[in-house]
Design a protein with these regions (language model features):
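Short coil-to-beta-strand
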Residues: 1-7
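A short alpha/beta connector and helix-capping loop motif
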Residues: 16-47
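Short, glycine/acidic-enriched capping/hinge loops at junctions between secondary-structure elements
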Residues: 15-17, 53-55
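Short beta-to-alpha linker loops that shape the active-site pocket of alpha/beta-hydrolase fold enzymes
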Residues: 9, 47, 132
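Active-site-adjacent betaalpha module
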Residues: 2, 29-35, 54-175
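Glycine-rich, proline-tolerant flexible connector loops at the mouths of alpha/beta enzymes
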Residues: 48-52
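Short acidic, Gly/Ser-rich segments with clustered Asp/Glu that frequently serve as metal-coordination loops
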Residues: 9-15
């Protein structure tokens, strides 16, 4: 098992996210539990390219202080929604013989959705801990509606096991 922390970058990790305090607490708790139980924590950052708001070299590109990686923890950069496409993550997980990926981070309706579905298609058991992903309101849905749609309907029982933070930690302890 690994804990995959997706796109928790300074530019977009803020109180405008749906249920921010619960999200922040869940992610911090899971990162600490993973480290305590020798579950590898892997980070992914999104780069929209030169001239975009979210691009390498600007302060907002770096990982949010509250979730920051420790020395030696892997960081993969991506340019598309999926954490698996063209990043080396897939090859790394296969090489390490990883079968289970717990996914946390941003944004529910973009990169988390793509990462969960692509991970599932690559044969990984995907775990989505409750309150450990979030998003913003958009033109069609509130952040809350997006969160509930994906976590309680789209992924659950199809692409991922959607469980509590506590259940996720129990799985970490058994690894």
């Amino acid at each position: 098992m690994v804990l995959l922390v997706v796109d928790t970058q300074k530019l977009i990790t803020n109180s405008d996210l749906y249920n921010f305090n619960a999200f922040e607490n869940a992610v911090k708790t899971l990162i600490a539990a993973a480290r305590e139980n020798n579950v590898e924590v892997i980070y992914v950052r999104h780069d929209d390219g030169v001239g975009a708001e979210l691009t390498k070299g600007i302060p907002g590109f770096e990982i949010y202080e509250g979730f920051g990686p420790q020395p030696g923890e892997k960081i993969f950069d991506k340019t598309v929604n999926s954490s698996f496409k063209g990043t080396g993550l897939l090859e790394y997980l296969v090489e390490k013989n990883v079968h289970t990926v717990a996914v946390v981070g941003l944004q529910t309706d973009y990169c988390i959705d793509a990462t969960i579905k692509c991970g599932f298609e690559h044969g990984f058991k995907m775990i989505v801990p409750e309150n450990a992903n979030s998003t913003f309101d958009n033109a069609f849905m509130t952040g809350e509606q997006s969160y509930k749609y994906y976590n309680q309907f789209m992924w659950k029982g199809r692409y991922a096991e959607c469980i509590s933070v506590e259940e996720t930690i129990e799985k970490m302890k058994k690894m």
